[in-house]
From Swiss-Prot:
The keyword Repeat applies. Gene3D superfamilies: 3.30.70.260. Residues 22-105, 114-197, 245-324 form the ACT domain. PROSITE patterns: ACT. It holds the Pfam family ACR10_N. It comes from the Eukaryota. May bind amino acids. It comes from Arabidopsis thaliana. This is ACT domain-containing protein ACR10. PANTHER family: ACT DOMAIN-CONTAINING PROTEIN ACR10, ACT DOMAIN-CONTAINING PROTEIN ACR4-RELATED. Keywords: Repeat.
């Protein structure tokens, strides 16, 4: 049983460049739906300039005003938004024993593949590869990149396929053709093989962990880490008898709504009504009427304080960027929190590669892994800069360029 996709998601594309397109989503509700939808919008590179959300706990209505790009794939976007929306049966509380196997079973973990790519090195090579994988909806879970003394690059990408077709010859040939068009004669060899999920396990050294995870973002730029300024969060439990009101003012950044929705999803908080607007100067105002999973407002001060503390940290520092010395070399470190569901932030590695390409900075090696500290899991991106083949750029400039690109402040 389901709803016609044309009724679930309606996209009204803007007629004039620079004007927002309007995405309307009308579907059954579930905790974390807003996070899942905003994650998709972030993956497609859309900038949300306004948003309205309302739900009665069973059915929700969401409207996003977004600024797209000339190459935005609107039909594919609609397909992914429909897939993320709950089925019709969800809204009517149909028992799990009456659901189809596809609806009653927990989601199957996607197959993990190893993409091995050998190329001649050049500036911007990694960005070109990540851009191709992004266009093909192939998700990078982990990467190991190294450069040999004779100028060859071996890229090992551990990837999953959104379309779940990478096990087919046709899909692998498609990936090869796209990479060949982007890389050209620089490509030396190419191969894809199925691997086990345990291969993605990774640990981070204690010195790196201390730098990235122990800083207090409530103060100044501790440990040289960048933060977003002017974050204000107010709580009102008196305005509504049934809801807790969260009022947020802050500076806009790429994925702002995703960071807010992700936090609420991790805390199992439901949004009954919400409004998001961007004022002049890229300042945002957000009003959210929220309830706990039991449908009641949040009266427990300890729960409320924990939520606000986490929310403030996510808005001040959704990602952490720092340059470190690694012997005579320079290492760029970027990290971001992982959802409790295990999903990481979209397009981080793509944006790191883009930022380094813009300032003609070469990459000698790169790794993506995960690190657990306390009750949280983080994605960690480690990039060793090839300073010999790069322009003489101050390390602070590299750090700032990567931060601005990740935050969407180019």
């Amino acid at each position: 049983m389901g709803i016609l996709s044309d009724d679930v998601v309606i996209i009204s594309q803007s007629e004039k460049e620079g004007d927002p397109s309007v995405i309307t989503i009308n579907c059954p509700d579930k905790t974390g739906l807003g996070c899942d939808l905003c994650r998709i919008l972030l993956f497609f590179g859309l900038n949300i300039v306004r948003g309205d959300v309302s739900t009665d706990g069973k059915w929700c209505y969401l409207v996003f005003w977004v600024i797209g790009k000339p190459n935005t794939r609107w039909n594919l976007l609609k397909m992914r938004l429909v897939e993320a929306s709950p089925s019709f049966s969800w809204a009517f509380g149909i028992s799990r024993c009456y659901l189809s196997d596809s609806e009653s079973q927990p989601p199957k973990l996607p197959d993990l593949f190893l993409l091995k790519l050998a190329c001649s090195d050049r500036t911007g090579l990694l960005y070109d590869v990540t851009e191709v994988l992004y266009k093909l909806e192939i998700n990078i879970e982990k990467v190991k990149i190294s450069t040999t003394p004779d100028g060859k690059v071996m890229d090992l990408f551990f990837v999953t396929d959104t379309r779940e077709l990478l096990g087919t010859v046709k899909r692998r040939n498609e990936v090869y053709e796209y990479l060949r068009d982007a890389i050209g004669d620089s490509m030396i060899s190419y191969d894809i093989e199925l691997v086990g999920p345990e291969i993605t396990a990774c640990s981070t050294s204690s010195s790196v962990a201390e730098t990235l995870f122990s800083s207090d973002v409530s103060g100044e730029h501790s440990s040289g880490l960048h933060t977003s300024s002017n974050v204000s969060i107010a709580v009102d439990n008196s305005l509504s008898s049934a809801h807790t009101l969260i009022h947020i003012t802050c500076q806009d950044h790429k994925g702002l709504l995703y960071d807010i929705m992700r936090t609420f999803k991790d805390f199992n908080i439901q949004i009954s009504y919400g409004r998001f607007t961007i004022k002049l100067g890229k300042n945002c105002e957000i009003d959210l009427f929220i309830v706990q999973s039991d449908g009641r407002k949040i009266l427990d001060s300890s729960k409320l304080n924990a939520l606000i503390t986490r929310l403030r940290a996510e808005l001040q520092q959704p990602l952490r960027v720092v340059m470190m010395n690694r012997g005579p070399d320079t290492e760029l470190l970027v990290t971001n929190p992982v959802e409790l569901s295990g999903k990481g932030r979209p397009q981080v590695f793509h944006d790191i590669a883009l930022a380094l390409k813009k300032i003609d900075t070469c990459i000698f090696s790169a790794e993506i892994g995960r690190h657990v500290t306390g009750d949280r899991e983080w994605e960690v991106y480690k990039v060793l800069i090839n300073e010999e083949d790069s322009l003489p750029i101050p390390r602070s400039k590299i750090e700032e360029e990567v931060w601005k690109t990740l935050m969407g402040w180019e």
